Amino acid sequence: MEESAQKTWSVAEPQKLTFEEPVAEVRVRMVGGTVNVVAADEGPARLEVAEVDGPPLYVVQEGGILTVSYEDLPWNGSQGFKEWFEGKPWKAWSSSGTGRKAWERSATVTLTVPAATRVQLATVGATAFVSGIGGATDIHGVSGDATLVGLSGKVKAKTVSGSVEAQSVTGELGFHTVSGGLTVVDGAGGNVRADSVSGDMLIDLALEDRAGQSPVNISLTSVSGQVAIRLPHPADARVEASTATGGVSNAFDDLRVSGQLGAKRITGTLGAGTGTLRATTVSGSIALLRRPAAQAAPLALDKKVL
């Protein structure tokens, strides 16, 4: 099958583009600004650029892959993005001979794509919003927060200081950060793996209707961040949660809290114990909360845990 020819656009001002050829994957690299990726029920992929400050965006469509980036920041995998900042004093580096620093740029873009599209985002100081995507979503961010709504594909997010909020995500969720936080609201995927150094984790699980699905697998690790997990009742998991010097709070009678001074643990089995819930932190607190049967109130960390 003959591959489609490469098509390119240089976008220096607000503009709308429609891509008649099929798009199976989008790759976006942004330095400052906002990037929105939204699933569409029908129609071709579309790009709306609302604002460009700095060098023009470089848009490429080839072989089902749509790339939105900059000409001096080509897509070359996550390693290529890292190399753009390393090996040079980039804060003093001027692009295009204009005297403008390479990082002094921003753009506001919205991509509307088929729901099955795979999404790869790499950002520095840019805010990301992804909604309704069923393909795999991969986010790499130095700073800047990301909001994920209604994703059903596998999600991987890696940040330095940016936080991630996931709402009604049903796919597997993996998160790695240094100081960014993770908030999961109405999480129905049942598979969450996250680790942080100092970022807090707030996990609200809506897992009441999981008949015939794989067991719940929650694994959270932090050094100094707080961890709060709200589980539906009845829950179904083996629980192992521990903190070396932080406090603990437990809302389940079937779980046992051990330890008085120093290390504390929450252990036991909820329901048949077919799933697993593991949470570990060194100096942060851990709270296991019961999710009300009715519409739940927003989850918040209680800094007064024992």
Specify the residue positions occupied by each region the protein language model found.
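Intrinsically disordered, low-complexity terminal regions
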Residues: 1-159, 163-306
